[in-house]
């Protein structure tokens, strides 16, 4: 299922909100939901994987100038993009993918290029979820959850988000329930990177407490 998000509106007072009806004054401009999703995916690609394609420079902590991102997007054919679009996408991202500060932006997680993003404070819940497909299960149960092309394995505290992730990779969704205490006993540090996303270097097979088939709503 494709991600769906409401429109973003730039209000006359300079604020960016979801839905023009939420402006306290007249909306000056609107970013439709479909375009918002496309822009967010492109932004994630720039900040996580290939900033150089767009002429964007990242610091060691993953920060980029918003103005530089806008310039890179415009040169790549996104001629309509303005800074408020980038700020709005970041501020209202439902998964907390992005962080803003003083005219800069970065992705909080998901990188395949080496950056140093400090974790957020807060302890993980006892169980975290990882969405995948049934086709991938045999290898996962043998080797554990590997990081693949990313710097870290990504887990979530949201069952709904795990199901959504699994659906992006196939029709037969499997959700893995990961025992956080098991990870700790094996010296694996779990770090909180957004309001629902946590990262770890690896999940050993023995730390997978349960596997659920989402389509049937029961354990395998």
Swiss-Prot record:
Highest taxon of source: Archaea
Keywords on record: NAD, Transferase
Coiled-coil spans in chain: none
EC numbers for this chain: 2.7.1.-
GO molecular function, one term: NAD+ poly-ADP-ribosyltransferase activity
Top-rank EC class of the record's enzyme: transferase
InterPro entries: Ptrans_KptA/Tpt1 (IPR002745), RNA_2'-PTrans_C (IPR042081), RNA_2'-PTrans_KptA (IPR022928), RNA_2'-PTrans_N (IPR042080)
Gene Ontology BP annotations: tRNA splicing, via endonucleolytic cleavage and ligation
Pfam family, one: PTS_2-RNA
Listed SUPFAM superfamilies: ADP-ribosylation
Role summary: Removes the 2'-phosphate from RNA via an intermediate in which the phosphate is ADP-ribosylated by NAD followed by a presumed transesterification to release the RNA and generate ADP-ribose 1''-2''-cyclic phosphate (APPR>P). May function as an ADP-ribosylase.
Family: Belongs to the KptA/TPT1 family.
Protein name: Probable RNA 2'-phosphotransferase
Name of the gene this protein is made from: kptA
């Amino acid at each position: 299922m494709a991600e769906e998000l409401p429109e973003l509106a730039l209000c006359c007072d300079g604020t960016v909100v979801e839905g023009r009806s939420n402006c306290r004054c007249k909306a000056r401009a609107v970013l439709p939901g479909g375009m918002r999703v496309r822009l967010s995916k492109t932004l994630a690609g720039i900040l996580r994987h290939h900033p150089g394609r767009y002429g964007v420079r990242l610091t060691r902590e993953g920060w980029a100038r918003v103005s530089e991102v806008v310039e890179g997007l415009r040169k790549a054919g996104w001629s309509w993009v303005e800074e408020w679009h980038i700020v709005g996408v970041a501020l209202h991202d439902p998964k907390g993918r992005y962080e803003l500060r003083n005219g800069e932006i970065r992705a909080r997680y998901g990188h395949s290029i080496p950056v140093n993003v400090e974790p957020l404070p807060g302890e993980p819940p006892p169980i975290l979820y990882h969405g995948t497909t049934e086709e991938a299960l045999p290898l996962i149960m043998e080797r554990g959850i590997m990081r693949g092309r990313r710097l870290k394995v990504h887990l979530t505290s949201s069952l709904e988000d795990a199901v959504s992730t699994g659906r992006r990779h196939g029709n037969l969704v499997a959700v893995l329930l990961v025992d956080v205490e098991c990870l700790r006993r094996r010296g694996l540090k779990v770090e909180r990177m957004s309001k629902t996303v946590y990262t770890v270097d690896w999940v050993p097979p023995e730390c997978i407490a349960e596997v659920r088939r989402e389509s049937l709503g029961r354990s395998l």
